[in-house]
UniProtKB/Swiss-Prot annotation:
Disulfide bond residue pairs: C172-C187
Signal peptide: none
E.C. number(s) listed in UniProt: 7.1.1.6
The organism's taxonomic lineage, starting at the top: Eukaryota, Glaucocystophyceae, Cyanophoraceae, Cyanophora
Subunit-level organization: The 4 large subunits of the cytochrome b6-f complex are cytochrome b6, subunit IV (17 kDa polypeptide, petD), cytochrome f and the Rieske protein, while the 4 small subunits are petG, petL, petM and petN. The complex functions as a dimer.
Record's protein name: Cytochrome b6-f complex iron-sulfur subunit 1, cyanelle
Record PROSITE patterns: RIESKE
Cofactor(s) needed for function: [2Fe-2S] cluster
Its biological purpose: Component of the cytochrome b6-f complex, which mediates electron transfer between photosystem II (PSII) and photosystem I (PSI), cyclic electron flow around PSI, and state transitions.
Binding sites annotated in the UniProt record for [2Fe-2S] cluster: C167, H169, C185, H188
NCBIfam families for this protein: Cytb6fFeSPetC (NF045928), PRK13474.1 (NF010001)
Gene: petC-1
């Protein structure tokens, strides 16, 4: 939960109050206030002064419920996860933003949308496989700009499908946990197996699939997956 306040300095013993959308502190004790979905708390900073009977101070607060991650949260998670896999880069703030904007055209001849790396460049299959070991699942920018996992098979070649990293519960980006051999959402605990099939809720559906191919110039490309989901033998819910 995000929770911010305006700093308040009050005499010792003061009573600081507010409405349901603000923070309340009584007698120096932390008091959680707000609606059932927007609750937060913080401790006041008191000045060394004589106790006051009662003094009211205005406290500016804002709370964002974790029940529904907004677009800002989703973009931030994309930024952090994609930045982490790319490693330190000078002026990193700019390059990583390329994952948060619509993809650019390009990537050679043939059908499909070119996968983009953390710098916004087309992903070349040769260089990708040089830096990603068998079993690796790392993010690239996929269809509609969504973070999408490219999978390296045990034989060192690229899997012919990619996994949309957006959790089907409330839209958080789901990281791959290699030690657990599954995708584990940090927001509400949903889990998916190595193929992206949901194995634990609250997520109701498996991660969306995308076709992965290599164009004539060696650029990796994504294409929409419209046929049966091989993991569930059902029509794709994302169609």
């Amino acid at each position: 939960m995000a929770f911010t306040t305006t700093a308040v300095v009050a005499p010792r013993g003061a009573k600081i109050t507010g409405q349901s959308s603000t923070c309340a502190i009584q007698n120096g004790k932390t008091v959680a206030v707000g609606t059932s979905k927007q609750v937060g708390s913080f401790k006041p900073v008191f000045a060394a002064a004589k106790p006051a009977k009662e003094t009211t101070f205005s406290v500016s607060c804002s709370a964002a419920s974790d029940d529904v991650p907004d677009m800002g949260k989703r973009k931030l998670m994309n930024l952090l996860l994609l930045g982490a896999i790319a490693g330190p880069v000078a002026g990193a703030g700019g390059p990583f933003v390329s994952f948060l904007v619509p993809p650019k055209a390009g990537g050679g001849a043939g059908a499909g949308q070119a996968a983009k790396d953390a710098l916004g460049n087309d992903v070349k299959v040769s260089s990708w496989l040089e830096t990603h070991k068998p079993g690796d699942r790392s993010l690239a920018q996929g269809l509609k700009g969504d973070a999408t996992y490219l999978i390296v098979k045990e034989d060192g070649t690229l899997e012919n499908y990619g996994l949309n990293a957006v959790c089907t519960h409330l839209g958080c980006v789901v990281p791959w946990n290699a030690s657990e051999n599954k995708f584990m959402c940090p927001c509400h605990g949903s889990q998916y197996d190595r193929t992206g099939k949901v194995v634990r809720g609250p997520a109701p559906l498996s991660l969306a699939l995308a076709h992965v191919s290599v164009l004539e110039d060696g650029v990796v490309a994504f294409e929409p997956w419209t046929e049966t989901d091989f993991r569930t033998n059902t029509a794709p819910w994302w169609k």
